[in-house]
Amino acid sequence: AGFNMWPGPYGNFSSKKTLVNALDGSLKRMGLDYVDIYYSHRFDPNTSLEETAEALDEIVRSGKALYIGISNYNAAQTAEIIKYFKELHTPFVVNQASYNMLNRGIEEDGLLDTLSQNNKALVAYGPLAEGLLTDKYLDGMGDDVKIHWSNEFVIKHGKDELVKKLNELNDIAKNRNQNLAQMSLAWLLHDPTVVSVVTGASKINHLEDNLKALNNLDFTSDELAQIDKIVKE
């Protein structure tokens, strides 16, 4: 819950009424008694984090969810709600955030460190930057290419500069016997705080190809330094 679930009052964000009603509706539609993980998918500027935490805790105590997650909460918001979860002994396990080799916002914000220090996990969504971190654009990007708002900043120096960076990253991937997508996923998963990635595939062979990232999750310090230099320059 967190984004629009229905029109009108309490149809989005993370108040107690919204969280409870949204889950009840989802369980009914799915024909289930409970979910494994229930996410507050968006920080609510009009609801205290204490209320959100207490609502999520009650949902677990009522047997409707086994674990709790949050999504799109920054480092400060995450640290504060973790404090409430600890007081309540709520089984909070994960924050889901936009993160990929090009999009380092959560590193700069301190979210990765906050989760690591509290022994909590990160699930990365947009791990391939909506297709940018694949072989799709190695030969160039047309004017009709649309980039998700969360990654728009990566073309601040122009599409040609981005294509140059993608090819430089691809050269590192080839030296690792991986393609760019596989290395991008492996780069995320080599961090012990990152327990999973949310990636889609329109074809089975795309999924099978992505899974090969698991064959090599180890990076040398030189590889990591080269990647950082390319991305951050």
Regions found by a protein language model. Name each.
Residues 1-7, 96-99:
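A short, structured active-site edge motif that brings together acidic residues
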Residues 47-232:
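Beta/alpha (TIM)-barrel catalytic core signal, keyed to glycine-rich beta->alpha loops juxtaposed to Asp/Glu
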Residues 12-30, 78-82:
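Short, acidic/polar
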Residues 3-20, 41-47:
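Active-site mouth loops of central-metabolism enzymes
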Residues 7-10, 39, 149-156:
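Short glycine/proline- and acidic residue-enriched helix-loop micro-motifs
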Residues 27-48:
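Active-site groove signature of glycoside hydrolases
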Residues 12, 37-42, 66-68, 142:
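Short N-terminal helix-initiation segments at or just after the protein's N-terminus
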Residues 1-3, 34, 126, 201:
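Short, small-residue-rich loop/turn micro-motifs
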